[in-house]
């Protein structure tokens, strides 16, 4: 199961800073920036308001993160059940 998109968005929402989120995800800052920008283009809605280096969730971003966290929790429960 690959929930990379959800992990990236949730981590950026948690840290509010692209560089810190990228470090936590073990990817480069430019790679995360491009990924988030492309995701927002594909969704047709911004998930984050950018204020300098600070990233703040939009209303759509808040809804996205709410569902993404639920998906990540289900993934964890699934993995715990299957691989225990």
Spans of features found by a protein language model:
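Hydrophobic residues on short alpha-helical segments
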Residues: 6-13, 58, 65
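The N-cap/first-turn positions of alpha helices
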Residues: 2-5, 29, 61
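Helix-turn-helix DNA-binding elements, focusing on the entry/boundary residues of the two helices
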Residues: 17-18, 36, 50
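Alpha-helical linker/hinge and terminal dimerization helices associated
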Residues: 42-43, 64-84
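Short helix-boundary/capping micro-motifs
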Residues: 10-28
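Hydrophobic a/d positions of heptad-repeat amphipathic alpha-helices forming coiled-coil signaling/dimerization
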Residues: 25-26, 61, 68
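A short LG(V/I)-centered, amphipathic sequence patch enriched
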Residues: 40-57
């Amino acid at each position: 199961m690959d929930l990379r998109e959800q992990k990236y968005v949730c981590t950026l929402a948690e840290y509010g800073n692209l560089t810190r989120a990228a470090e936590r995800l073990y990817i480069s800052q430019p790679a995360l920036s491009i990924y988030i920008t492309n995701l927002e283009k594909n969704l047709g809605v911004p998930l984050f308001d950018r204020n300098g280096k600070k990233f703040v969730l939009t209303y759509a971003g808040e809804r996205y993160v709410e569902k993404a966290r639920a998906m990540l929790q289900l993934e964890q429960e699934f993995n715990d059940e299957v691989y225990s």
